[in-house]
Design a protein with these regions (language model features):
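Conserved beta-strand-loop surface patch within small alpha/beta domains used
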Residues: 1-81, 90-142
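Short, well-ordered beta-to-alpha junction loops that form the rim of enzyme active sites
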Residues: 87
């Protein structure tokens, strides 16, 4: 990728992710991102909140039934699956070695919310491919 992709996320969707991550703390929380993409800009229009069936603070696995239902719902509403998000309860907002190893879609946006500082949660977006991650430009708006 020569140029970073821009990802737009509303404050409302950020709060939705944050509330789900805080409710799941100290375990990782997870979900899917849906929206539209045009001219290198990904506009996230829906955030799905899924169950981490691993119930772990070091890794996550999305509930397969919830994942399928969320994808069906987003497609029925004319949205595309654009990626996923998960929280890091105690580590920085960047992909761990396990995140990089398990990344399955080089075209997906991977958002990571760090709750390491509970006072100032930190959300970042990445692309992961060929064993490496690249930052995406994340724009939060009202």
């Amino acid at each position: 990728m020569n140029q970073a992709t821009k990802v737009r996320l509303s404050g409302e969707h950020f709060q939705k992710i944050l509330r789900h991550a805080e409710a799941g703390y100290p375990n990782e929380a997870c979900g899917l991102l849906a929206g539209v993409e045009q001219d290198g800009v990904r506009d996230i229009r829906e955030v799905s909140l899924l169950t981490n069936v691993d119930a772990s603070n070091e890794h996550f696995s999305m509930d397969p039934r919830e994942q399928l239902a969320a994808i069906k719902d987003m497609r029925a509403r004319g949205l595309r699956p654009l990626g996923n998000w998960h929280s890091h309860p105690e580590t920085p907002s960047r992909p761990s070695a396990e995140d990089v190893r398990l990344a399955y879609d080089p075209g997906a946006t991977y958002m990571i919310l760090s709750l390491r500082s509970r006072i100032a949660p930190n959300l970042n977006a990445f692309r992961i491919r060929e064993g490496r991650y690249e930052w995406e430009i994340l724009e939060l708006y009202d």
